[in-house]
Amino acid sequence: MLLAHISDTHFRSRGEKLYGFIDVNAANADVVSQLNALRERPDAVVVSGDIVNCGRPEEYQVARQILGSLNYPLYLIPGNHDDKALFLEYLQPLCPQLGSDANNMRCAVDDFATRLLFIDSSRAGTSKGWLTDETISWLEAQLFEGGDKPATIFMHHPPLPLGNAQMDPIACENGHRLLALVERFPSLTRIFCGHNHSLTMTQYRQALISTLPGTVHQVPYCHEDTRPYYDLSPASCLMHRQVGEQWVSYQHSLAHYAGPWLYDENISCPTEER
């Protein structure tokens, strides 16, 4: 199994720019082109929320067109910038597993050595996350049904504070309910989130919990400064690979850079310098 995991694309309406100057649509189209050109091709691409910026139909039209050009199966979940009904209307054709209920978008993928569980942590009218009773009950049933098979959850909001002064106040408000499932089910070993626009990792019991960078703009990690900074530091995604019984995640740059070159020991340490 190999998954490419991106997040927080924040598509805008055609011709509009994010914050008035960031061409997110062009940048995301470039990301799609890079993913389509990967030498080691993923089995699927995951997008963990905030697909669009303002929840408008025109933004979802752009998102569907650009994300629809990916040459891989696509797994999508909404974030706090998304409109649930419009998300489902425009993007369900790209991810039919989401079902037809905008208030209960979730799915389980059991095609790999690790079970993949996708849930919606967004709540209309707020940037904070929330897990409904139905979502918790569904997760509990899925984890019980999966037995000892390892399970990974993809959601938008991190379920616990990460020491980020800007983003912690808008994390998942009742994430403790998910952490209680981590305690009950040893098979739940990973939780991957978007939302924070930065690569952050922590651990709760046996579960690795991580957020990842956005595809275009990033949010610097600050422990004390609550001012809402963002920047255009190089974007990246995560690649998740099943290696035997191990799950290995690594960062893949989405910036344009020179290389790669084949390693040559004679150039690395020339004979005359030995």
Curated annotation (Swiss-Prot):
Q: Per the UniProt record, which EC number(s) apply here?
A: 3.1.4.46
Which pH dependence is annotated? Optimum pH is 5.0 for mono- and diesters hydrolysis.
Is Iron found in the keyword set?
yes
What highest taxon heads this organism's lineage?
Answer: Bacteria
**Residues holding Fe cation 2:** 50, 80, 156, 195
Query: What enzyme class is recorded for this protein?
Result: hydrolase
Q: Briefly, what is this protein's role?
A: Catalyzes the hydrolysis of the 3'-5' phosphodiester bond of glycerophosphodiesters such as glycerophosphorylethanolamine (GPE), a typical phospholipid metabolite which is probably the natural substrate of the enzyme. In addition, exhibits a broad substrate specificity and can catalyze the hydrolysis of various phosphomonoesters, diesters, triesters and phosphothiolates. Preferentially hydrolyzes the phosphate diesters over the phosphonate monoesters.
User: What is this protein identified as?
Assistant: Glycerophosphodiester phosphodiesterase GpdQ
